[in-house]
Every structure is written in structure tokens, then in C-alpha cells.
């Protein structure tokens, strides 16, 4: 299917926070509870609609292990958006956010949109990180913030699409150089001058790989 723009995303965060599960829920609308760890980088894609235009999201799901960190860094450079994920039931994954964020900002373009995601919101009884803490971290570092559940699909659509809306708005504002694909944006065959309103919807797609 043709598209007006292609946006490249990267999903980052510690092992086991649900990065692959979020991607699978967004692209395939299903939850896979039993899964293997992501080895290196896996890939997914889906078409959405913003302002009446087809936008293709090309999403790279990265391994959280330190041994794969150098591979992950190479994918920052071509990304327009990043989903930085922690697990609300594991305090250590929240404590590691600063390291992930520093890594992302060091190796990406300065205009990359970063969405902070507190995943596993369905496990409220096991929560170790308050929602207010996630909100405060996002405010301090200039990030967008949402809590999600890859299991129930709560806010999963919104997380991916709101990130795309921010990227789209930056294009409208002239922040992104859309002729430089190093910014993680590619002009598609459907491209025409864009208007200012943002009406968002989505349609399904497919992705291979397992959940971590």
C-alpha cells in the first residue's frame, strides 16, 4: 500500500519490560504470554492514518541485554521516534531509564520524539512505580508519557499513534528536514502538501518475531 510518509521507530528499555509484546499488540492485535528473548533487533510495520494521509510506521524492537547495546545504538541514528519502556512492577527497570535516555539522546538526532511508557498497567496489585513518578520523569526530561498494558491492549494504540502525531506536527512546523532520511522520515509516493488538522485512525498490519 502506498503512503505519504514513512516514520521509523525504535523500542528501547530493559529486558522483559514488554517491548516485543507492545509491538505485537500494535501490529497484530494479539498478546503472546510465552515468549523468547529478542536477539538483536526484530521488526514490525503498520499503516495508520493522520490528517487523511497514510503513514507507514516501521518499528524496530531491540534487545534489552547489555551485550546487544552496540547493535541497538546503530538503530537510534535513523529513528524519528523512540518508545522508552519500563515495567511498573519492577523498580529497577524505572531506575535504568536515565541510562537508556542518555544513550538514546547521544546516538540519535536531536529532534527524535521520545514516548515514555510504563507497561503492564494491568498488574496494579504488583505495582512498584507510581504513575506520578513516570509523569515526573517525563516532565523533567521533556518526554510524552503513557501507561500501557500489552496484555489488555490498554493505551497501546494511543502510545504508537500519539508518537506519530508528534512527529507529524514537527514536520508541519518545519522542525524535521524530511529530505534527509537520516531523520527517520521518508517521503512516500502518496505525499502531497499537508494541512494542519490531525485526525488519527489505524489499520492492521503484520509482524514476525517473539515477545520480550
From Swiss-Prot:
This is Ras-related protein Rab-2. It comes from Lymnaea stagnalis (Great pond snail). GO terms for molecular function: GTP binding; GTPase activity. It is found in: Endoplasmic reticulum-Golgi intermediate compartment membrane; Endoplasmic reticulum membrane; Golgi apparatus membrane. Keywords: Endoplasmic reticulum, ER-Golgi transport, Golgi apparatus, GTP-binding, Lipoprotein, Membrane, Nucleotide-binding, Prenylation, Protein transport, Transport. The keyword Transmembrane does not apply. PANTHER family: DRAB11-RELATED. SMART domains: RAB, RAN, RAS, RHO. GO terms for biological process: protein transport; vesicle-mediated transport. A lipid is attached at residues 211-212 (S-geranylgeranyl cysteine).
